[in-house]
């Protein structure tokens, strides 16, 4: 109730982050989100456990900490609108409540709606898969959650490159500088291929030491080792996939990306059922994580 009641700040933060990145300023969103993360980390134990003068609010405390952090991020981003020295700063002097031509709304919906639908469907599919994983016990659920966080070393990096390439591609596409688009894609492709191969080597060759940082019981450790080995072989492909989606989105081709992603992501559910009945257990879900 608390989080959903003030979810508008989450929406505003995503919008402002996209606008800052589109005009070539990725430092401001980084600084704002870092401060929000630190604020959330500090407030969580204070409000959940009731340390010092703070009341013990438990779950409500976690929600309040999250919302407060989101408001902090929003405040920092608004502050940067007026203090950033980046030129041109398209956000400064923006009249939010002005009337705009109808074609602007049409173009925004044409580009943004497919991605929004894709994200919603992805969340629903993830919930179904999580329900399927829960049938294998607490260890499988723990590995699913922690394994995703370990893998974020790869996909968060790729996602950052995708955001940058999105803005870079859109700017040069508008300026009709197509050679720069190709050059930017090739450079990003090379960097992320190398990074993906490094992560692949780490996951495939060192799965037990990495898993041992998070798990100690034999069951969870065994599942985690299998998880890292299987997803390890796809890290370079996943990085290139996310980067390519960013480039195509910069060209306005979000519908194509969404259709492909929805079809292949949706295929995880019947494949998970098939592999589970084949006796692969929780490892079946891991195979589906391999992009």
List each language-model region with its residue ranges.
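Short alpha-helical transmembrane segments in multi-pass integral membrane proteins
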Residues: 1-6, 54-113, 169-234, 276-289
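Transmembrane helical elements of multi-pass membrane transporters/channels
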Residues: 2, 36, 69-73, 77, ...
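Transmembrane alpha-helical segments of multi-pass small-molecule transport proteins
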Residues: 2, 6-11, 33-41
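Alpha-helical transmembrane segments of multi-pass membrane transport proteins
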Residues: 9, 36, 118-122, 158, ...
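Small-residue-rich hydrophobic transmembrane alpha-helices
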Residues: 10-29, 130, 141-201, 205-207, ...
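Alpha-helical transmembrane segments of multi-pass membrane transporters
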Residues: 28-57, 71-77, 199-203, 256-284
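Helix-terminus/linker motif at the lipid-water interface of multi-pass membrane proteins
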Residues: 46-57, 120-153, 171, 209-218, ...
